[in-house]
Amino acid sequence: MVLADGRALHIRPIRADDAEALRRGFSLLEPEEIRLRFMHPMRELTPELARRLSTIDTRSDFALIACEPPTHGQPSPPIVAVVRASIQTDRRRAEYAIIVAHPFAGLGLGRHLMRRVIRWAQYRRLDEIFGDVLDENTAMLALADSLGFRRDRAPGEPGVIRVRLPLKRASTTR
């Protein structure tokens, strides 16, 4: 994909061997970006958590990463964005999460990744995709609004908004 500023990024499914690139990408994130995504501060992405995040069950999970195009003979470039979704136990809904490093934010990458995860959920014939967003995460709330998500309070979580997109009427062309 080509960003609004002309930079090219490689988008692909996450792989188990992405754990180290995921950790390198985590170091690009600002503390506030981490808090807004994980809903609590984290100083580092531990090797164990990186392994867990980079290993998915494709029967119920979906995850894409964005990185600069790989250079032959060089280590994998750091991952600068991740979107993931997991089908819930009811098999009718999926919960999504997304993070985009600040040097790549506001350039269409988040919208592109969200459209991809919505298409995956539609392909899986799910009824809804949803995510929990801190009410101060105005960028994510604005993106969700622009894609047709509805807002509700997350059950039992003060300061958290649940954004939901019913998929039978979803439009990913906005």
Model regions and ranges:
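Long, contiguous binding/interaction regions
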Residues: 1-174
